Amino acid sequence: MPKYYCEYCDIYLTHSSPVGRRQHIHGRKHISAKIEYFQNLLREEGITPQNFLGFLNNRNINNPLGNPMMNYMNPNMYMKYNPMKSYHSYSMRSSHPYRLNIHNNKYSRAGYVPPSHHKYSVNPMHNNYHQAHNNYSYPNSINPSNQINYSNNYGSNNFNNSNEFNKNMNEKDNINNNDIHDNKVKTDENDPINNDNLNNTRNFSYEENHYSTDHKKPSFLNPENSKEHIESDIS
């Protein structure tokens, strides 16, 4: 069995078992050699702490080392530049062939938001941008920003509808009040109530005249006639 070679320490390990490799990787000598290796690499590239951020911004996106997502397409890239770590791909052992190597922690979940950040942005331009560029939402799903806009629009519509309803009711009340006032001031001869009262008065006077004229009997409305009529009935 070939012995394991450490590129950072430039030695062959006496014990090539996983336990021996783990002990060597956590050893002080290996850590110091690894730090020195990367310091020399940065010095050769001309990278200093002052221009390190600029170097990160100017990286080529197609570079597998600059773009970590490229490592999922070619899992051997990590082993090519890091021979110390034994290669055991989680995605190859998984039953799902398209499952990526994503650890199950709270920071890798899709809906995780740090406590100091708002889950929904308060900037309307930010929400509109994400709505226009959100190509991964399902057709039947509603974005949280859409729900907020929908609730605001629904509430404003209800408020406007209630105002219109109250306005219409007030107009109807004013019309009814004006009609009642006009009826009190003016007496309409075509009004059925007035006609009934007028007819009753006419009928009463007609009956009185008819009774007193045709039958030649005194009217009951005259007090003297009523007295004579009562005395005649008694006798």
Swiss-Prot record:
Pfam families: zf-U1. GO terms for molecular function: mRNA binding; pre-mRNA 5'-splice site binding; U1 snRNA binding; zinc ion binding. It is found in: Nucleus. InterPro entries: Matrin/U1-C_Znf_C2H2, Matrin/U1-like-C_Znf_C2H2, U1-CZ_Znf_C2H2, U1_snRNP-C, Znf_C2H2_sf. A zinc finger (Matrin-type) spans 4-36. Residues 169-189, 205-217, 225-235 have a biased composition (Basic and acidic residues). The keyword Metal-binding applies. GO terms for biological process: mRNA 5'-splice site recognition; spliceosomal snRNP assembly. Gene3D superfamilies: Classic Zinc Finger (3.30.160.60). Its main location: nucleus. One of its GO terms (cellular component) is U1 snRNP. The keyword Endoplasmic reticulum does not apply. Residues 131-235 are annotated as: Disordered. Keywords: Metal-binding, Nucleus, Ribonucleoprotein, RNA-binding, Zinc, Zinc-finger. Transmembrane segments: none annotated. U1 snRNP is composed of the 7 core Sm proteins B/B', D1, D2, D3, E, F and G that assemble in a heptameric protein ring on the Sm site of the small nuclear RNA to form the core snRNP, and at least 3 U1 snRNP-specific proteins U1-70K, U1-A and U1-C. U1-C interacts with U1 snRNA and the 5' splice-site region of the pre-mRNA. Belongs to the U1 small nuclear ribonucleoprotein C family. This is U1 small nuclear ribonucleoprotein C. The lineage of its organism: Eukaryota, Sar, Alveolata, Apicomplexa, Aconoidasida.
